[in-house]
């Protein structure tokens, strides 16, 4: 089996790329970073530090790399069996034209074997969004062939991969936590279902997408925002602060109540899942910076993301949300000289005030009780 993976960054190398290579799949990375491409093609291997209760170093070998903006990547798409991505949500649109060209070439060469594409991004139904971009880049005459031969498979991914401490001297070395979860929608595949250790197949993907979004992502973001306000450097430092931990755990329990109501998750098992995530935040080997985790607050405060979406669920079912509101208020306070969205958020609040700014960013009604609650919490944490 041959696979092409877009995105040779830390998540690409440390998570999805590693799982594919470990499964014996012939793997080629596609990226724009020439330093990483050259290193991969010189060595065809790299080291992954897996850290947790037991630390180990795994070697991923037998890999190649191509530029994601050249002809080589188009040629590869015509022949591989699987395409995966870990490029970040905003980059999906940028790689779509190359994928479209590769699919056209595949059709022209008469390659009718099924191809499956899986976007492994921190977003809801990312592959469906990628499919939209790819279809927009195709001529009408090619769309029916693509619909018939190409599976666009949505997934939920979960593994904390912080920037590597050794990145200064080895561009390929990466550190990851022990925990990983890659859940894919088995109803969207073309051809036979693949058997890849570490890939879990489900016919109820949205339950797992929202479980991860409402728990890991919600908790991670609130830990970062409260941690930044309290002057903590890392996620571990922040979650060991009992006052922060209480709010984070409370917020995950509030979002969890929505999941239990919506999808019928077992309450005891979900409580154990929350505890597992709190344990992951405490991992002493992961130097996960609160500023990195908190960046892009405008996206994280948008209607479909990790703070507002669970809040909307509590409103839908008439459930408590006091800790989620505290997290939203902390996000509104996020400031970072490194992050354009943080600067835009600050300017918007300065211009319009917290009430109108939050309503504009989140889509919530400016005159609603919940916006008033968030503004009160925001003012109380100044």
Swiss-Prot record:
Example GO molecular function: mannitol-1-phosphate 5-dehydrogenase activity
InterPro entries: 6-PGluconate_DH-like_C_sf (IPR008927), 6PGD_dom2 (IPR013328), Mannitol_1_phos_5_DH (IPR023028), Mannitol_DH (IPR000669), Mannitol_DH_C (IPR013118), Mannitol_DH_CS (IPR023027), Mannitol_DH_N (IPR013131), NAD(P)-bd_dom_sf (IPR036291)
GO CC, alphabetical: cytosol
Keyword DNA-binding: no
Enzyme Commission number: 1.1.1.17
UniProt superkingdom: Bacteria
Leading EC class: oxidoreductase
Keyword Phosphoprotein belongs to the record: no
Binding-site positions, NAD(+): 3-14
Catalytic activity, reaction form: D-mannitol 1-phosphate + NAD(+) = beta-D-fructose 6-phosphate + NADH + H(+)
Disulfide bonds: none
One GO BP: mannitol catabolic process
Record keywords, A-Z: NAD, Oxidoreductase
Family listed: Belongs to the mannitol dehydrogenase family.
PANTHER family: ALTRONATE OXIDOREDUCTASE-RELATED, MANNITOL-1-PHOSPHATE 5-DEHYDROGENASE
HAMAP family named in the record: Mannitol_dehydrog
Protein name per its UniProtKB record: Mannitol-1-phosphate 5-dehydrogenase
Gene responsible for this protein: mtlD
